[in-house]
Swiss-Prot record, chain B:
Highest taxon listed in the record's lineage: Eukaryota
GO molecular function, one term: DNA binding
Function (record text): DNA-dependent RNA polymerase catalyzes the transcription of DNA into RNA using the four ribonucleoside triphosphates as substrates. Specific peripheric component of RNA polymerase III (Pol III) which synthesizes small non-coding RNAs including 5S rRNA, snRNAs, tRNAs and miRNAs from at least 500 distinct genomic loci. With CRCP/RPC9 forms a mobile stalk that protrudes from Pol III core and functions primarily in transcription initiation. Pol III plays a key role in sensing and limiting infection by intracellular bacteria and DNA viruses.
Assigned GO CC terms: RNA polymerase III complex
Entry-linked Pfam families: RNA_pol_Rbc25 (PF08292), SHS2_Rpb7-N (PF03876)
GN (gene name): POLR3H
Name of protein: DNA-directed RNA polymerase III subunit RPC8
Length: 213, 204
């Protein structure tokens, strides 16, 4: 086989299993099981070569190790994770049968606990429109991405909380600005489950639909 | 609190699952492998976000299963430094206050990062903030089950993968591994105004 585009194939090609070889696995298209049938006599050799290739030098194991391409590709708000987990739960409920297999137990545990945690925060009542409105309103305050994310996740109602989340807030924000920021946050973001009782005292027109009797 | 991590991995689908849609099988396999597990230097993996690319699937000699290289994004719990989080007190010990988020338990607030002055009440095994006002000292107890707001000041990853046979001599000298280390721990601090039990700071 003199096709230059396939470096793994050569006189000793049968001993190197495709895909295990470092290099471009895309060179091989699809399962080549029929080729192995052709080389009958070499069958046993190729098997042992493959298993030794796998068990041996990790450098030769090409695409078989898990690799992290970017450990910080994007920050997610609690609302986005809440949405994702709720959708996942719905999907799994519909497909029914294999939820309880031992392999799925970890996923069940982590989704249940994380959902439980986020449901107790104000993020539960948010929506994509609210988040968009919030971020547009935040543009004028000149905060960093991390600060805006914390405000979105926690919905602070007091000045002391703002000071915790915004770095060097005494230097960057005056008292009126902090008040304005608080007002934006509390008016755009809906209150959390426990904060509803505390909201009664304030004169903000409540965004939440539930009636806290 | 949560970040998206882009990863690449080879997923093995056994032949008896070939009738299922490949995407569903891969989703399940990835979640089975990563959900609720801590990845070294990455964080606690929660669930799969999406699959960005599927490369060709190969069948290797001697193994009937298909192997597919998958590029995907995973939701990982990995708070950034100085992030404010709210958790529940799980317990107190002389090492500090242990806080839990429900899905993540290994958060410690060491004694020096508590609101000062603080003392450990041996009888009740609880940390106390001795808050001074003009009236006198109030003892504010940090009881179990209370919600606290804290700042993440440090994180540490421990590689808990099993050691090879070469260290067997060292391991056999001690009966068992001394203690099970948590693969991912966070250090918190509540020494600023606004931090600590939520009940301390709600205006009444």
């Amino acid at each position: 086989m003199a096709r230059g585009a396939r470096p793994a194939r050569g006189p000793a090609g049968v001993l190197q299993a495709p895909g295990v070889h470092r290099g471009d696995p895309g060179v091989h298209r699809g399962a080549r099981s029929r080729l192995w049938g052709v080389r009958r006599g070499a069958g046993s050799r190729s098997f042992s070569a493959w298993s030794s290739a796998c068990a041996g030098d990790p450098r030769r194991r090409g695409g078989e190790d898990m690799e992290v391409k970017d450990a910080n590709a994007a920050l997610l708000s609690n609302y986005e994770v809440f949405q994702l987990l709720t959708d996942l739960k719905e999907q799994r409920k519909e497909s029914g049968k294999n939820k309880h297999s031992s392999g799925q137990q970890n996923l069940n545990t982590i989704t249940y606990e994380t959902l439980k945690y986020i449901s107790k925060t104000p993020c539960k009542h948010q929506s994509p429109e609210i988040v968009r409105e919030f971020l547009t309103a935040m543009k004028s305050h000149k905060l960093t991405k991390a600060e805006k994310l914390q405000l979105l996740n926690h919905r602070p109602v007091t000045a002391v909380e703002i000071q915790l989340m915004v770095e060097e807030s005494e230097e960057r924000l005056t008292e009126e600005q902090i008040e304005a920021l608080l007002h934006t946050v509390t008016s755009i973001l809906p209150a959390g489950p426990e904060a509803e009782q505390q909201q009664n005292a304030s004169d903000d027109v409540a965004m939440d639909e539930e009636d806290p009797a | 609190m949560f970040v998206l991590v882009e990863m690449v991995d080879t997923v093995r689908i056994p032949p008896w699952q070939f009738e299922r849609k490949l995407n569903d099988s891969i989703d399940e396999e990835l979640n089975k492998k990563l959900a609720n597990k801590v990845m070294y230097n990455v964080g606690l993996c929660i669930c799969l976000f999406d699959i960005t690319k599927l490369e060709d699937a190969y069948v290797f000699p001697g193994d009937g299963a298909s192997h597919t290289k998958v590029h995907f994004r995973y939701v990982v719990f990995h708070p950034f430094l100085d992030e404010i989080l709210i958790g529940k007190i799980k317990g107190c010990s002389p090492e500090g206050v242990h806080v839990s988020l429900g899905f993540f338990d290994d958060i410690l607030i060491p004694p020096e990062s508590l609101q000062q002055p603080a003392k450990f009440d041996e009888a009740e095994q609880v940390w106390v903030w001795e808050y001074e006002t003009e009236e006198g000292a109030h003892d504010l107890y940090m009881d179990i089950g209370e919600e606290v707001r804290f700042r993440v000041v440090d994180e540490s990853f421990v590689d808990t993968s099993p050691t090879g046979p070469s260290s067997a001599e060292a391991a056999s000298s001690s009966e068992e591994l001394p203690k099970k280390e948590a693969p991912y721990t966070l250090m918190g601090s509540i020494s600023e105004p606004g931090l600590g039990l939520l009940s301390w700071w709600t205006s009444s």
